Amino acid sequence: MKQLFRDQLSNTQLVSRLFATAKKSGEHGNRAIYGQGLMDLGAATNPWGTPAFMGAGSSLGNSDGASMATSFISLGSALGDSLPQSLNTQEVAAFDDLGAPFWFEASDFTVPSDGASVATRLNRFLTPPQRPPIPTNWQFNFQEKAAATETGHLALTHGASRFTMAGPQGVAATVFQKSQDLEGLTLSWTPAVLPALTMEAGYLNEHQSLLNSQGSGAFGRLSGQTLFLSAGLDTSLGDWELEAQGEVGQVNPSVSHSQFIDTISPLATSTFRLAASRPFVNGSALRFSLSQPLRVHSGAASLSLPTGRTQEGAVVGTTLSAPLVPSGRQLDLSTQLDVPWLEGDLSLGATRSTQPRHQQSAAPEWTFFTGYRATW
C-alpha cells in the first residue's frame, strides 16, 4: 500500500484507512470477534466514495474539491486535439473521501471535437455561401434560431437569432443573440465603386463557452470575446466566377471557478475559403471550393495540476503551459453539380476533408450529399 500511494500516506494513515474500509456489516460488525471489522484490501486500495480534484496548494479537509465525475472539458472544433496533445502522458491526482491520492491520465478528461455535425454540413451544402447583392432600398430581415452555414467565426452563432439591416450604400449590419449564451454584431461594407470587394468586422461575446469549448468541474467555466476582420473578393475569368474570402480574429478568453486552469492567453484564429463556379446555358452549374474551418493558430493555457499530497495533507502540483494549437489543419475540397430537374434543382456534392477536426493523425474523410430544391 505504501508503494501504491507512492509513500504519500504515513503508516498511521495507512492503518486508519484499513480500519475505515474494513467490512463491518453483518457478522463482521461484532467487535468482540472482528474488532475493527474484516480487513478488505480491495476496498482499501480503491477510491472510497467519489474522488475529487483539489487545487494545488490547498489543504485536504479545508477546501471543497470538484467531483471527478463531472470534471471534463469538451473542445470546440477550432481547438481540435490541442489540449489532449498538450496533456499527453501528464498525470493528475484526485483524492477520495479519506484523503488518499489516485492518479489518472489528464488527457482522459478532455473530449476532442467531433467536428461539424451532419446536419450542419447538409445546411452548408444546400445553402452555399453567397454574397447578397447591394439592395436598391433599405432591407430588414429577421431569423429566429438560425442555422449557421458559415465556416468562419460566424459558425459560432449556430442557433442564435439574427436581425440584419442592409442599405443601398453597400453597408449592412447584423445583430446576433442567443439567450444567456451569446450576443454579437457584424458590420460589412461593399464599396459602390468596387462591388467585387466586401469588408467586414465582427464582435462575438460567448458567455458559457470559448470558441464552442465548454468546461465543467475542475476545468471551471469558460467564456470569451472575439473580434474578427474578414475580406472577400469576387471576380470573373471567362465563364468562371471566382471567390476568395479570408478571416482573422483574436479571442480574449476568461476562466472562473477552475482548479486546473489559471489563465488562458489571447488566441489568434483564422479561416479561409476559395471557390469557383461555372454556370451552363441549360441552367446547370458546377462548383468547386477549398476551405479551412475556423482554427486557432496561437495561444496557450497556464495550468496548475494536482499531482499528489504530503503526509501532512497539503496538495502538491505542477504548473505547465499547454499550447492550444491543434496538431493538424483541416482542408475541405468540395465539388457540387446543380442540374435542373422537374421544376426544381437536383444537387450532387462530395467533400474530401484532410486532417479532419484539425487532427494530424486523422485519416481523410469523404462526405457525399444529394439534395433537391423546388419552389412554388
Question: What are the functions of these language-model segments?
Answer:
Residues 1-32:
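Hydrolase catalytic cores
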Residues 28-49:
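Caspase-like cysteine protease fold
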Residues 44-134:
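Secreted peptidase-domain scaffold signal
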Residues 105-248, 360:
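Outer membrane beta-barrel translocator domains of Type V secretion systems
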Residues 136-153, 157, 258, 299-314, ...:
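A subset of solvent-exposed loop/turn segments in beta-rich extracellular surface proteins, enriched
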Residues 174-175, 184, 197-200, 204-223, ...:
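Outer membrane beta-barrel transmembrane domains
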Residues 335, 339, 363-376:
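Outer-membrane beta-barrel "beta-signal"
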